[in-house]
Amino acid sequence: AGRGKQGGKVRAKAKTRSSRAGLQFPVGRVHRLLRKGNY
């Protein structure tokens, strides 16, 4: 219930962390797809 209120604050404070997580998230997803697709 309080996730939306905390999300804004956490997002503003974890700006650098968000950037790092965003980079690791897609990379992991792409890596998994690449491995499954045998590209």
UniProtKB/Swiss-Prot annotation:
<keyword id="KW-0539">Nucleus</keyword>
<dbReference type="InterPro" id="IPR032458">
    <property type="entry name" value="Histone_H2A_CS"/>
</dbReference>
<keyword id="KW-0832">Ubl conjugation</keyword>
<feature type="compositionally biased region" description="Basic residues">
    <location>
        <begin position="1"/>
        <end position="18"/>
    </location>
</feature>
<keyword id="KW-1017">Isopeptide bond</keyword>
<keyword id="KW-0238">DNA-binding</keyword>
<dbReference type="GO" id="GO:0046982">
    <property type="term" value="F:protein heterodimerization activity"/>
</dbReference>
<dbReference type="GO" id="GO:0050832">
    <property type="term" value="P:defense response to fungus"/>
</dbReference>
<feature type="region of interest" description="Disordered">
    <location>
        <begin position="1"/>
        <end position="24"/>
    </location>
</feature>
<dbReference type="GO" id="GO:0042742">
    <property type="term" value="P:defense response to bacterium"/>
</dbReference>
<feature type="modified residue" description="N6-lactoyllysine; alternate">
    <location>
        <position position="9"/>
    </location>
</feature>
<feature type="modified residue" description="N6-succinyllysine">
    <location>
        <position position="9"/>
    </location>
</feature>
<keyword id="KW-0295">Fungicide</keyword>
<feature type="modified residue" description="N6-(2-hydroxyisobutyryl)lysine">
    <location>
        <position position="5"/>
    </location>
</feature>
<dbReference type="InterPro" id="IPR009072">
    <property type="entry name" value="Histone-fold"/>
</dbReference>
<dbReference type="GO" id="GO:0005634">
    <property type="term" value="C:nucleus"/>
</dbReference>
<keyword id="KW-0929">Antimicrobial</keyword>
<protein>
    <recommendedName>
        <fullName>Histone H2A</fullName>
    </recommendedName>
</protein>
<dbReference type="GO" id="GO:0003677">
    <property type="term" value="F:DNA binding"/>
</dbReference>
<comment type="function">
    <text>Buforins are strong antimicrobial activities in vitro against a broad-spectrum of microorganisms including fungi. Buforin II is more potent than buforin I.</text>
</comment>
<keyword id="KW-0044">Antibiotic</keyword>
<comment type="similarity">
    <text>Belongs to the histone H2A family.</text>
</comment>
<comment type="subunit">
    <text>The nucleosome is a histone octamer containing two molecules each of H2A, H2B, H3 and H4 assembled in one H3-H4 heterotetramer and two H2A-H2B heterodimers. The octamer wraps approximately 147 bp of DNA.</text>
</comment>
<feature type="modified residue" description="N6-(2-hydroxyisobutyryl)lysine; alternate">
    <location>
        <position position="36"/>
    </location>
</feature>
<feature type="cross-link" description="Glycyl lysine isopeptide (Lys-Gly) (interchain with G-Cter in ubiquitin)">
    <location>
        <position position="15"/>
    </location>
</feature>
<comment type="function">
    <text>Core component of nucleosome. Nucleosomes wrap and compact DNA into chromatin, limiting DNA accessibility to the cellular machineries which require DNA as a template. Histones thereby play a central role in transcription regulation, DNA repair, DNA replication and chromosomal stability. DNA accessibility is regulated via a complex set of post-translational modifications of histones, also called histone code, and nucleosome remodeling.</text>
</comment>
<feature type="modified residue" description="N6-acetyllysine">
    <location>
        <position position="5"/>
    </location>
</feature>
<dbReference type="GO" id="GO:0000786">
    <property type="term" value="C:nucleosome"/>
</dbReference>
<feature type="modified residue" description="N6-(2-hydroxyisobutyryl)lysine; alternate">
    <location>
        <position position="9"/>
    </location>
</feature>
<keyword id="KW-0379">Hydroxylation</keyword>
<keyword id="KW-0007">Acetylation</keyword>
<keyword id="KW-0158">Chromosome</keyword>
<dbReference type="GO" id="GO:0031640">
    <property type="term" value="P:killing of cells of another organism"/>
</dbReference>
<feature type="cross-link" description="Glycyl lysine isopeptide (Lys-Gly) (interchain with G-Cter in ubiquitin)">
    <location>
        <position position="13"/>
    </location>
</feature>
<keyword id="KW-0544">Nucleosome core</keyword>
